From Swiss-Prot:
Protein name: Carboxymethylenebutenolidase homolog
Major subcellular site: cytoplasm
Purpose of the protein: Cysteine hydrolase.
Modified residues (N-acetylalanine): 2
Name of the coding gene: Cmbl
EC annotation from Swiss-Prot or TrEMBL: 3.1.-.-
């Protein structure tokens, strides 16, 4: 993802070689990757892609990790058939590319996914998790959908306007200290404004020494020094879902 005022490169990081536990389905007008929980507890989590798309193995790995913790997970194609960002692409064209993939205009897709989860997966309790571009989607959804019980926004760009602080349900925000995409000043502003305006539970957590994408685009076995932070962030994500979904 990139700063809204000045879009800039987002490194794809370590792309995992991962096949996945789930399968692809058609959900009304969009495709999606679905993984059923080994235990059907009536709980589901929507997992929202970053700019590299719904088929990125890293995102599917995260969805499967969540599924192993008792949730049916779904990774919808929120780009609705449009191409994801190509890591080898010309970054000068990124602002135009991003404009046609507005993370705050996804209600039609969210509504379709909610219908699918309730009708086909018998989900009664639903949460949402998103990374980078998907973190913005989570923030938007948590201000608009009171029936989504919990959200985790992982390094999503922050827009400073009154409506983004009116969260409907508990939301966890995860950031990286050395994120060149999201300045710490933005994180501080978010923290202060939530303190002033938000009436539901929330947490803003910044991980020391980490960079943009560390939770889902770093291989912990290749970065031993980062492994504790990656594991802690993933554990926090699951704990938040367990507590509020």
């Amino acid at each position: 993802m990139a700063n809204e005022a000045n879009p800039c490169p987002c490194d794809i990081g370590h792309k995992l070689e991962y096949g996945g536990m789930g399968h692809e389905v058609q959900v009304e007008h969009i495709k999606a990757y679905v993984t059923r929980s080994p235990v059907d507890a009536g709980k589901a989590v929507i997992v929202v892609q970053d700019i590299f798309g719904w088929q990125l193995p890293n995102t599917r790995y995260m969805a499967d990790m969540i599924a192993r913790n008792g949730y049916t997970t779904i990774v919808p194609d929120f780009f609705v058939g449009q191409e994801p960002w190509d890591p080898a692409g010309d970054w000068s064209t990124f602002p135009a590319w991003l404009k046609s993939r507005n993370a705050r205009k996804v209600n039609r897709e969210v509504d379709a996914v909610l219908r699918y989860l309730r009708q086909q997966c018998h989900a009664q309790k639903i949460g949402i998790v998103g990374f980078c571009w998907g973190g913005v989607v989570v923030h938007q959804v948590m201000t608009a959908y009171p029936d989504i019980r919990a959200g985790v926004s992982v390094y999503g760009i922050i827009r400073d306007s009154e409506d983004v602080y009116n969260l409907k349900n508990p939301t966890l925000f995860i950031f990286a200290e050395n994120d060149t995409v999201i300045p710490l000043e933005q994180v501080s502003t978010l923290t202060q404004k939530l303190k002033e305006h938000c009436i539901v539970n929330y947490q803003v957590k910044t991980f020391s020494g980490q960079t943009h994408g560390f939770v889902h685009r770093k291989r912990e076995d290749c970065s031993p020094a980062d492994k504790p932070y990656i594991e802690e962030a993933r554990r926090n994500l699951i704990e938040w879902l367990n507590k509020y979904v």
